[in-house]
Amino acid sequence: METPLKAPESSLKPYNEPSSCTSERDVTAQELAKQGEELLAQLHRPLEPCTNKCYCKRCSFHCQLCFSKKGLGISYERKGRRRRTPRKTKTPSPSAPDKSISTRTGDSQPTKEQKKTSEATVVTTCGLGQ
């Protein structure tokens, strides 16, 4: 009778133990996750003021703030509103109350002479009814 050959137990690894390949993958995945978090932290960091005042192409792409201000021309600063000079109220001159309302505002209604001339032109234009 022959006895079957048994493999030494030390050479067989149970399935649930992590292999060296998976542990290296886990380490690289963790490093990539850390790098991604750092990049996101840098991206969401508030913009710092830049004192560069040159508008050349190189300086316009210097940082995100320079690009938004110089490259795109966007500025989120409050613009100062112009203050109007107060209007001077004019006091009516003494001759103003003597004038009638129509002469101050302009003649909006035709006078009697203008009415007569407009009626005469209407009669002449009607004519025989061609």
Curated annotation (Swiss-Prot):
GO MF annotations, alphabetized: RNA binding; RNA-binding transcription regulator activity
Major site of localization recorded for this protein: host cell
Gene3D superfamilies per record: Tat domain (4.10.20.10)
Top-rank taxon, per record: Viruses
Start-end of Polar residues biased regions: 100-109
UniProt-annotated stretches for the region Core: 67-77
GO biological process: positive regulation of viral transcription
Example of a GO cellular component annotation carried by this entry: host cell nucleolus
Region spans: Disordered: 1-28, 77-130
Residues with Phosphothreonine modification: 85, 89
Skewed-composition ranges (Basic residues): 79-90
Classification via InterPro entries: IV_Tat, Tat_dom_sf
Keyword terms: Activator, AIDS, Host nucleus, Host-virus interaction, Phosphoprotein, RNA-binding, Transcription, Transcription regulation
A Pfam family the protein falls into: Tat
Protein localization: Host nucleus, Host nucleolus
Motif (Nuclear localization signal, and RNA-binding (TAR)): 78-90
Similarity-based family: Belongs to the lentiviruses Tat family.
Quaternary structure note: Interacts with host CCNT1. Associates with the P-TEFb complex composed at least of Tat, P-TEFb (CDK9 and CCNT1), TAR RNA, RNA Pol II. Interacts with CCNT2; the resulting complex is unable to bind to TAR RNA.
Domain notes: The Arg-rich RNA-binding region binds the TAR RNA. This region also mediates the nuclear localization.
Protein name stated in the entry: Protein Tat
Gene: tat
